[in-house]
Amino acid sequence: MLTIGTALRPGATRVMLLGAGELGKEVAIECQRLGLEVIAVDRYADAPAMHVAHRSHVINMLDGAALKQLVAQEKPHYIVPEIEAIATDMLVELEKMGQHVVPCAEATRLTMNREGIRRLAAETLQLPTSSYRFADTDSAFFQAVRDIGYPCIVKPVMSSSGKGQSLIRSEEHLQAAWEYAQQGGRAGSGRVIIEGLVHFDFEITLLTIRAVDGIHFCAPIGHRQEDGDYRESWQPQAMSDIALQRAKEISAQVVTALGGFGLFGVELFVCGDDVIFSEVSPRPHDTGMVTLISQNMSEFALHVRAFLGLPIGTIRQYGAAASAVILPELTSQNITYRGLETALIGDTQIRLFGKPEIAGKRRLGVALAVADNIETAIEVAKKAAGNIEVSGE
C-alpha cells in the first residue's frame, strides 16, 4: 500500500523532475495535488516547472556525474525524466543502486535515441515500421539514401521538436540535409536515421498507460505538424474500429516491452485499416496537452497515478476538443501577454507556460477548446491562441 509523506517534512515523498518545461510543469502540479514534494531540474533557470516546485536546480543533465551528485543530495523517491537530453546510462546505474526511475531506466535509455526504439519495434517486436537505415558518416549517409530511395526523411537519432529533420526529394538536397542533421542533434553531430516516406491518411498519438491495474488507452489524438513540431491537436481522431484495435495492440506490445509504470506517448501512422509504428516517448506528449480539457484525467494526472502505483480506473473523454499552440516570434527576457479577455470566450481555456525568455520562435502557451465537433474545436482553439498578444522589452 502506498504511503505519501507530507511535503517539506522529514517523511516527505520526493519526486525529482528531470526537465522542467511546460509538460514537467503540469506533472509538478499533479504531484502537488497529492502532497508530493517536487524538485525541478533543468539546464536553465526559471523554467516553467520551477515556478510550481518546492525546490529547483540548474545542471547539465547530460553530465552523469553532476546528475548522480544531485540525486545523492536530494534523495528522491521517484526520478521522472521529462525530456530526452539526459545521461540515460547514469539513470541505469542509479536504478541499479535502488533509485526508482520512471517508468524505468531501460525505457528512457532505449527511447532517448531513435535507433534504440526502432530496433526494438522493428527487429525485436517485428512491428510494421517505415523502411530505415542508420549512418554516422557522410558517405554512409549518401549510400543509405540511395538504398532507401527518394523521397526520404533524415533525422538525428537524438533530437526533438523537428530539429535537424529534413525531407530529401532528390540528390541535390543530400549535402544540405546531412549538414542540417549534424547541427540538430541534442548531443551535437553524430548518427542519423534515414526513413522511407510513409504514405498515410493521418498520424495519431495513442496515449497508453501501463499501471498496476493493467494497460489503459486514451482516445486517439490527431495533430497537425509544421517545421517538425505540432501546431494543433485534437481528440478524438476518427478512425476505423479495425485500425484502432491494431493501434492498441501495437502500443500495448511496445509499452510492455519497455516496462515500468507510467504514461507513454505512442506515435502511429494510419492508412485505412493499416497502422505503422513511428515513435514512442515514455512520458507525457506535447500533443496530449489537449487532455487538459478533453478528459476527466489529463495525461499528466494519469502519468503520476501510474508511476505512484495507483490504479487508473476509468478514463472519461468529454467529446470533441482541441489545442492550438501560442507560438510568437520575438526576442525578449521580459515577456508580457495581452488579449486573454478576448481569447477566453465560450468553452476555452488558456495555459501560459511562464518561460523566462524567447529568441526567435518559441512555444509559450496553448489554447484549449471543446465544441460540438472537431473542426469547430480546432477553429475555436486557433482563434483563442491568435487572440493572445505577446510582446517584450
Curated annotation (Swiss-Prot):
Keyword ATP-binding present in the record's keywords: the answer is: yes
Q: Which residues bind Mg(2+)?
A: E267, E279
**Reactions this protein catalyses:** N(1)-(5-phospho-beta-D-ribosyl)glycinamide + formate + ATP = N(2)-formyl-N(1)-(5-phospho-beta-D-ribosyl)glycinamide + ADP + phosphate + H(+)
- Binding residues for N(1)-(5-phospho-beta-D-ribosyl)glycinamide, per the UniProt record? E22, L23, E82, D286, K355, R362, R363
- Described function: Involved in the de novo purine biosynthesis. Catalyzes the transfer of formate to 5-phospho-ribosyl-glycinamide (GAR), producing 5-phospho-ribosyl-N-formylglycinamide (FGAR). Formate is provided by PurU via hydrolysis of 10-formyl-tetrahydrofolate.
Name under which the protein is recorded: Formate-dependent phosphoribosylglycinamide formyltransferase
EC number assigned by the record: 6.3.1.21
- Organism of this sequence: Yersinia pestis
One BP annotation, GO: 'de novo' IMP biosynthetic process
Q: Which gene encodes it?
A: purT
Q: In which pathway does it act?
A: Purine metabolism; IMP biosynthesis via de novo pathway; N(2)-formyl-N(1)-(5-phospho-D-ribosyl)glycinamide from N(1)-(5-phospho-D-ribosyl)glycinamide (formate route): step 1/1
